[in-house]
């Protein structure tokens, strides 16, 4: 249910961008995916029963295991160079087996989506290469993280979506026009999220997570 709600909110945000665009503005809708990783980060908190934890977690992305890493974005291009958009990115992190075993966790995952939703500014340089077909671009965005928290430690078992804190995203890529309507693209995308999750026994878990992804995608322009 919560996953459906997140998807609906993302679609509503994309639709609102389209609704506010003037008739002559260029709109684009993009879908993307690719390998995504996350470096180690510190995990702090308590299980709600008096057990505190503070350790460095090794994260695994498992980008192509269900549910896979993917993203969708809508952009309203005000002119040839400047655009505004909304980006929903289903990134995920699993604590490694060694991390869980060393620190007493049965589960430690943000895996049915770390779910980074951001409002972005885009800047592009149209037709710079390949006879005008290649367009480099950059983007930055601010938003929120809405992960599916799957944490089990001692008698505390947490399983569900939460709004856990602020997020930022940054992108650099290049787009190749197939024709007037369709384009393919490749990009690097990074995210940072500062997460504070509530555990079911009254405890909490805090961690800051960085993700790095190399994406390929398809864009529809209208």
Each predicted region: which residue ranges?
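Transmembrane beta-barrel strands of outer-membrane/channel proteins
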Residues: 29-35, 86-90, 138-144, 174, ...
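Bacterial N-terminal signal peptides
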Residues: 8-16
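Predominantly the C-terminal beta-signal and adjacent terminal strand-loop region
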Residues: 41-42, 59, 178-222
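Extracellular loop and loop/strand-boundary signature of outer-membrane beta-barrel proteins
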Residues: 57-60, 102-110, 153-161, 200-206
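Strand-connecting loop/turn motifs
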Residues: 24-26, 35, 79-81, 131-135, ...
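Residues that define the transmembrane beta-barrel architecture of outer-membrane proteins
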Residues: 66-70, 112-117, 134, 162-168, ...
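Gram-negative (and chloroplast) outer-membrane scaffold detector with strong preference
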Residues: 75-153, 214-221
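Short glycine/proline- and aromatic-enriched beta-strand/turn motifs that initiate or cap beta-hairpins
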Residues: 23-76, 149, 215-221
């Amino acid at each position: 249910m919560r996953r459906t709600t997140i998807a609906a909110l993302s679609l509503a945000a994309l639709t609102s961008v389209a609704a506010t665009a003037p008739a002559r503005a260029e709109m684009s809708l993009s879908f993307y995916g690719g390998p995504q990783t996350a470096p180690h980060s510190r995990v702090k908190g308590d299980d709600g029963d008096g057990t505190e934890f503070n350790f460095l977690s090794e994260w695994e992305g498992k980008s192509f295991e269900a549910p896979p890493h993917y993203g969708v974005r809508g952009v309203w291009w005000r002119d040839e160079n400047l655009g505004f958009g909304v980006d929903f990115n289903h990134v995920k992190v699993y604590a490694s087996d060694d991390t869980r075993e060393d620190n007493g966790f049965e589960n430690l995952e943000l895996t049915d989506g770390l779910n980074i939703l951001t409002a972005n500014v885009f800047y592009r340089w149209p037709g710079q290469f390949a006879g005008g077909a290649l367009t480099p671009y950059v983007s930055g965005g601010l938003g929120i993280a809405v992960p599916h928290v799957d944490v089990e430690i001692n008698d505390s078992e947490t399983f569900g979506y939460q709004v856990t804190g602020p997020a930022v995203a940054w992108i650099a890529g290049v787009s190749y026009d197939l024709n007037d309507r369709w384009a393919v693209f490749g990009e690097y995308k990074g995210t940072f999220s500062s997460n504070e999750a509530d555990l079911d026994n009254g405890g909490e878990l805090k961690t800051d997570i960085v993700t790095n992804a190399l994406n390929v995608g398809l864009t529809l322009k209208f």
